[in-house]
């Protein structure tokens, strides 16, 4: 996908006379919406949201099939051509958090200098190096997020690649779910609007994904309902320039904790299965206690070097006076 018109030459889709249509719950009957031949197997569209950003149209559709609940993001370009991304609801939540980081970074950027714009013109109007980049990896999919700039403005380019393997939530086309990379370009001015719309869909339709991921019997009425029907809420902490996100989720393998480390320049994450939480917690507590003892010993040695012994002599003299 070429970069033009704030990121894409395909961004000329009609601005939609009706404007943003708000959230539209869709009929829950079975029906299309899935990509490829497998997409018609009882895929339900639960909600749809349209956004008109500059001269582009974006659609966010929450869908559900036998593999779980997922989100499709479509950018409609000139002539009705579309670029689509498919995200599980868990990845959509990570994507929402990443958008928050890009929004903060974009807000801190100053206007482009004439020299920078001239350099972009000499390069044919193509995007310069990324102003900020992150990537997400989940199962057989990778998502690359790059905040870029060309003569038309700044934009967030989001590219999805799918490795060969089992088909994903959307039932991707091709043998074994193989699918060429898809890219959308979101004008930077619409980042907040896009993030807020995504967050609303996640709040409204992401809560049951844990039950869906558990498969048959994992719902509230099944034997696993107590485990998959309710999970702890996610949280985050900030340390210096880093942010750590703690998100509890579940899939067919069980409950897990995803710990994401986010800095302005990169994002990394680990997944800890539920059965290892106690060991991880014990290890953290043990190291915290050991470091506390080490710090206390170091403080004691420092006091001694600064003449702590003289204080002891004063106490001795004081005791002798009292005895007299």
From Swiss-Prot:
Induction summary: By fasting or glucagon.
Residues the record lists as Phosphothreonine modifications: 43
Single Gene Ontology BP annotation: positive regulation of transcription by RNA polymerase II
Protein's name in the database: Transcriptional regulator protein Pur-beta
Positions bearing Omega-N-methylarginine: 28, 164, 306
Phosphoserine found at: 6, 8, 113, 310, 316
Main subcellular localisation: nucleus
InterPro entries for the chain: PUR-bd_fam
Entries under Pfam families matching the protein: PurA (PF04845)
PANTHER family in the cross-refs: PUR-TRANSCRIPTIONAL ACTIVATOR, TRANSCRIPTIONAL ACTIVATOR PROTEIN PUR-BETA
Locations listed in the record: Nucleus
Ranges of biased composition (kind: Acidic residues): 314-324
Record has Lipid biosynthesis as a keyword: no
Origin species: Mus musculus (Mouse)
């Amino acid at each position: 996908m070429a970069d033009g018109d704030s990121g894409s030459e395909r961004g000329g889709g009609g601005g939609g006379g009706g404007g943003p249509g708000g959230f539209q719950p869709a009929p829950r009957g079975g029906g299309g919406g899935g990509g490829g031949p497998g997409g018609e197997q009882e895929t339900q569209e639960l909600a749809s949201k349209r956004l008109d950003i500059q001269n582009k149209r974006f659609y966010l559709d929450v869908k559900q099939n036998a593999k779980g609940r997922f989100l499709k993001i479509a950018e409609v370009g000139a002539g009705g051509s579309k670029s689509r991304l498919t995200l599980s609801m868990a990845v959509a939540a990570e994507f929402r958090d990443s958008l928050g980081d890009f929004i903060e970074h974009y807000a801190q950027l100053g206007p482009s200098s004439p020299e920078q714009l001239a350099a972009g013109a000499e390069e044919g109007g193509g995007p310069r190096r990324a102003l900020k980049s992150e990537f997400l990896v989940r199962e057989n999919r990778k998502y690359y997020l790059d905040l870029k700039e060309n003569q038309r403005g700044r934009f967030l380019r989001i590219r999805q690649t799918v490795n060969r393997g089992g088909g994903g939530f959307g039932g991707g086309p091709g043998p074994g779910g193989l699918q060429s990379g898809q890219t959308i370009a979101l004008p930077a001015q619409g980042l907040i609007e896009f993030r807020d719309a995504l967050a609303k869909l996640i709040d409204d339709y992401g809560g049951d994904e844990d039950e869906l991921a558990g498969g048959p019997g994992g719902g509230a009425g099944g034997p696993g309902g107590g485990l998959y029907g309710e999970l702890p809420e996610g949280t985050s902490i900030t340390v210096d320039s880093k942010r750590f996100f703690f998100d509890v989720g579940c899939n067919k393998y069980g409950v897990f904790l995803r710990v994401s480390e986010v800095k302005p320049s990169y994002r990394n994450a680990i997944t800890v299965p539920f059965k290892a939480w106690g060991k991880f917690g014990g290890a953290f507590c043990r190291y915290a206690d050991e470091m506390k003892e080490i710090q206390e010993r170091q403080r004691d040695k420092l006091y001694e070097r600064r003449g702590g012994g003289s204080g002891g002599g004063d106490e001795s003299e004081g005791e002798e006076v009292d005895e007299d």
